[in-house]
């Protein structure tokens, strides 16, 4: 059995955050490991505007997938929230969008800023019928302006 493991290890403010995505061949096809959850944090609020951009300078893109067979999931609701250029959270830096017919998404923002000892990050919450809600965070590598970040969901039982 072949395993392909992709590690992204951004190191910021002395803390290491590891995100991994592995796919393995199986008789039934591919299996994707679920995206690791991360804390919701105290700044989440529902009802963010429907939009794919809250700034310029950083692009986060990827595919929403099922962990069961690694296939793309369409119409997944993806919520983003992050700090603005001043390091503060606010409604101007919240967005809701949906994965497209290929399961992909593309989100434009400013480069997130650190605050209260936390490294720069983008909060993400993904919901879609038939799957467990995913709450995670993306930690940009210092000095980058874009990243690929697949969101792999676990089916409800």
Where do the protein language model's features map onto the residues?
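Beta-strand-dominated extracellular/periplasmic modules and repeats
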Residues: 25-157
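Bacterial N-terminal signal peptides
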Residues: 9-19
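Bacterial N-terminal signal peptides that target proteins for export
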Residues: 1-11
